[in-house]
Amino acid sequence: MDIDPYKEFGATVELLSFLPSDFFPSVRDLLDTASALYREALESPEHCSPNHTALRQAILCWGELMTLASWVGNNLEDPASREQVVNYVNTNMGLKIRQLLWFHISCLTFGRETVLEYLVSFGVWIRTPPAYRPPNAPILSTLPETTVVRRRGRSPRRRTPSPRRRRSQSPRRRRSQSPASQC
């Protein structure tokens, strides 16, 4: 099965892959951030949003993965094999979990549309040859003010209101009322 965990949120694994692996904070930092910002909503029995649900699932999945890694570490006799398993989990699974946690925390913090615009902006920036792109990559927290990505079908917002049309300078002609209609 080809399952993309970002599909229902308007993103793709490929879109997140444009961000380098060292872009994502450590799992510990992301878990601390999620706990500090969203602990009440994550622990609540109420459904808050699809991002909260996905974040809960990613946190639970990471916990189970750490339980498995501990079990393997304690039960695998060969140190070289143990090292291989730990490296695989940290490199591959760790990156996927860091991407998931970052995406859903960012969606909850900045809004899904802003995060998607950021991913597209970064993807365009990273694919542009260095000689032709700005020296600094887009920054998520400043994106709403500086984004150049526009949604299709909408005209850009104008900074000043458009001038109002002037009415004709000639006085309006009033219908003359007949004396009988004044009663």
Swiss-Prot record:
Residues 155-177 are annotated as: 3 X 8 AA repeats of S-P-R-R-R-[PR]-S-Q. Residues 136-183 are annotated as: Disordered. Residues 177-183 are annotated as: RNA binding. Phosphorylated by host SRPK1, SRPK2, and maybe protein kinase C or GAPDH. Phosphorylation is critical for pregenomic RNA packaging. Protein kinase C phosphorylation is stimulated by HBx protein and may play a role in transport of the viral genome to the nucleus at the late step during the viral replication cycle. InterPro entries: Hepatitis_core, Viral_capsid_core_dom_sf_HBV. Residues 149-176 have a biased composition (Basic residues). Its main location: virion. The keyword Transcription regulation does not apply. GO terms for biological process: microtubule-dependent intracellular transport of viral material towards nucleus; symbiont entry into host cell; viral penetration into host nucleus. The keyword S-adenosyl-L-methionine does not apply. One of its GO terms (molecular function) is DNA binding. It comes from the Viruses. HAMAP family: HBV_HBEAG. This is Capsid protein. It comes from Chimpanzee hepatitis B virus (isolate United Kingdom/LSH/1988) (HBVcpz).
